[in-house]
């Protein structure tokens, strides 16, 4: 179904970006080449500073052939209605089911300073469809990434009622913390974020503490690591106050899982107009987490949401409308895995010189408990003019047990 993609398309991006603390003007050409079922998207970008000097790092392919991979934005085979399809690289606008767990997710929110490499693949065999999604395979070595699965069954052509189940897990929300040198100590805790052999510098003088292992020369180690102006060799070990080993991605995990069931029926389906009615049941679970040094403590939370009835309609491929009645219990919000999920999956702040880590659930549900409940109408409208201009608006009128929330 549908028209085949054009053999060639071109996207363009102009803006400014900060790389390694320096502001650059950015010109990006993003050609898309389609041959049969294969599509390749490229990212050809030039960065110039305010004096007009081009940054060479991205084009030093002779010394770093791996840079060629950075030029590939995505590789795609087939489309989502084909018997088998797969996409590798950038993932945008990903929704599982009716979006109660994941809606409009993108792994490109911090591009190009953070390049995530995702996988989205699936199949359609007769009445059965399946889909698998990984947000960033680079996170696999850092304790885990966001993984999504969907299975759907359509009763028949005469009765196109579809039943679906969705499962999403973020195996380690902490892997959203940046760790440039890959030593498992996030940059925010790492006194040497660009050197994988070093991490602690208690007195902040640029010389590492002892205890970094045999790969660090003795001549590099700080002779007064705690900065009290007494050489450590002449001091009792008990009097040398050094930082503890920093928070590590290897030893600490904070996960979340979501499970949902949905049922939908297309009342109308044509190029001009579509109308779908549906119902969806979603759950979210956040296991309790306590790190060995108690630097991070998260209480267990869970919640659920039911959307029934739900109605979605599109007109001429330009206007999209949705309306649903939602009933929410406990620590659940619709679209927990949303477009900005990678930005707020885990956040850090500094309080009294201490770095505090909070996973998204701790920020979103800090005023909730598992007996909180609300219900009400949610509606949204979107306008898309020829894929050039997009507008969207939403309305919610949710009545809680005690208060009324309008947005």
Locations of the language-model features?
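Long, internal scaffold/assembly segments composed of regular secondary structure
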Residues: 230, 238-363
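Outer-membrane beta-barrel signature, preferentially recognizing the C-terminal barrel domain
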Residues: 124, 252-262, 366-375, 382
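Solenoidal tandem-repeat scaffolds enriched in leucines and small polar residues
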Residues: 138-178, 192, 201, 239-268, ...
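Extracellular calcium-associated, cysteine-rich motifs in secreted modular proteins
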Residues: 177-240
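Non-catalytic interaction/regulatory modules that flank or connect domains
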Residues: 315, 373, 382-407
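Extended hydrophobic-aromatic, low-complexity segments
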Residues: 201, 321-322, 333-334, 389-393, ...
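Outer-membrane beta-barrel channel domains
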Residues: 2-10, 16-155, 160-165, 299-302, ...
């Amino acid at each position: 179904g549908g028209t085949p993609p054009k053999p060639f398309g071109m996207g363009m991006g102009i803006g400014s970006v900060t790389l390694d603390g320096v502001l650059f003007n950015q010109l990006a050409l993003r050609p898309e080449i389609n041959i049969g079922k294969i599509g390749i998207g490229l990212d050809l970008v030039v960065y110039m500073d305010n004096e007009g000097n081009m940054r060479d790092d991205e084009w030093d392919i002779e010394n770093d052939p791996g840079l060629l991979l950075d030029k590939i934005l995505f590789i795609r085979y087939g489309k989502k209605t084909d018997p088998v399809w797969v996409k590798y690289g950038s993932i945008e606008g990903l929704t599982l089911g009716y979006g109660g767990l994941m809606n409009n997710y993108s792994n490109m929110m911090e591009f190009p300073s953070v390049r995530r490499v995702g996988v989205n693949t699936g199949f359609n065999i007769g009445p059965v469809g399946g889909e698998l999604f990984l947000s960033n395979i680079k996170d696999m070595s850092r304790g885990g990434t966001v993984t999504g699965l969907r299975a759907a069954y359509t009763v028949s052509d005469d009765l196109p009622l579809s039943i679906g189940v969705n499962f999403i897990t973020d195996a380690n929300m902490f892997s959203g913390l940046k760790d440039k040198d890959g030593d498992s100590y996030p940059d925010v805790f790492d006194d040497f974020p660009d050197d994988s052999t070093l991490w602690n510098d208690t007195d902040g003088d640029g010389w590492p503490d002892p205890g970094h292992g045999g790969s660090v020369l003795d001549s590099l180690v700080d002779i007064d690591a705690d900065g009290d102006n007494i050489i450590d060799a002449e001091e009792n070990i008990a009097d040398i106050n050094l930082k503890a080993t920093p928070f590590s991605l290897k030893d600490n995990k904070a996960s979340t899982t979501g499970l949902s069931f949905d049922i939908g029926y297309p009342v109308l389906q044509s190029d001009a107009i579509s109308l779908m009615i549906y119902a969806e049941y979603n759950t979210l679970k956040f296991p309790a987490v306590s790190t060995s040094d108690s630097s991070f403590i998260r209480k267990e939370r869970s919640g659920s949401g039911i959307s029934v009835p739900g109605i979605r309609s599109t007109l001429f491929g330009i206007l999209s409308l949705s309306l649903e009645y939602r009933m929410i219990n406990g620590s659940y919000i619709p679209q927990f895995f949303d477009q900005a999920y990678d930005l707020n999956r885990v956040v850090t702040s500094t309080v009294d010189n201490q770095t505090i880590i909070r996973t998204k659930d701790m920020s979103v549900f800090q005023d909730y408990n598992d007996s909180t409940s609300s219900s009400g109408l949610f509606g949204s409208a979107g306008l898309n003019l020829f894929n050039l201009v997009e507008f969207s608006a939403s309305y919610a009128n949710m009545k809680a047990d005690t208060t009324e929330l309008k947005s």
